[in-house]
Design a protein with these regions (language model features):
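Short, T/G/N/S-enriched strand-turn elements that build extracellular solenoid repeat scaffolds
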Residues: 1, 14-21, 34-40, 53-60, ...
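Well-ordered beta-strand segments characteristic of repetitive beta-sheet solenoids
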Residues: 4-12, 24-31, 43-50, 62-71, ...
Length: 178
């Protein structure tokens, strides 16, 4: 049974590998969060961890907010069901390769890591607003080799280098790539 609210704060590693955390509102603050093959579900999920490993993990919520320096999401899933803003604030490397999935119903979605690796991964934006990917403020790299980046709205992609070999990037209402 899900707790009303769950807040976990540690100055070390929070390890939910293979585990399950569920609550109405879930807040996790740690130096490192490991959710490898774990499950996190709540109406609202908020994660703050400089190092966040969600490899094989599943995070599902109406609202998701992630703040990390580096996020590894190999074969993991971040699924936001609600239409509110989804926060995936990664300042370093966002590695969604190897079957990673980021999907949201939010009106807009902005991803602004210094490096985005979506090789073999999927980023799906069901909102009708704008999907913005800004790798390194226009100087970073975006790789989407055999990956999929799609939006029902407008796609704006900015990167210093971009590789979409065998990949798909599409925007229902338009696509801008620089």
């Amino acid at each position: 049974t899900a707790a009303q609210n769950l807040q976990v704060t540690t100055s070390g590693t929070l390890d939910n590998s293979g585990g399950s955390m569920s609550a109405a509102t879930l807040k996790a603050n740690a130096v490192s969060l490991k959710n490898a093959n774990g499950t996190i579900s709540a109406s609202t999920v908020s994660v703050t961890a400089p190092q966040f490993d969600n490899s094989g993990g599943k995070i599902t919520a109406n609202e998701i907010n992630v703040s990390a320096t580096n996020l590894t999401n190999h074969n993991g899933a971040l699924t936001q069901l609600g239409s509110g803003a989804m926060g995936v604030n990664v300042s370093g490397t966002l590695d969604n390769s190897g079957g990673g999935l980021i999907q949201t119903n939010s009106t807009d979605l902005t991803l602004a890591p210094s490096t985005l690796n979506n090789n073999g991964g999927t980023i799906t934006h069901a909102g009708t607003g704008t999907l913005t990917i800004d790798s390194g403020s226009g100087t970073g790299s975006l790789t989407n080799v055999s990956g999929k980046i799609v939006t029902n709205g407008l796609a704006n992609l900015t990167a210093g280098s971009m590789d979409d070999t065998g990949g798909t990037i599409s925007g229902q209402t338009g696509l801008n790539a620089t």
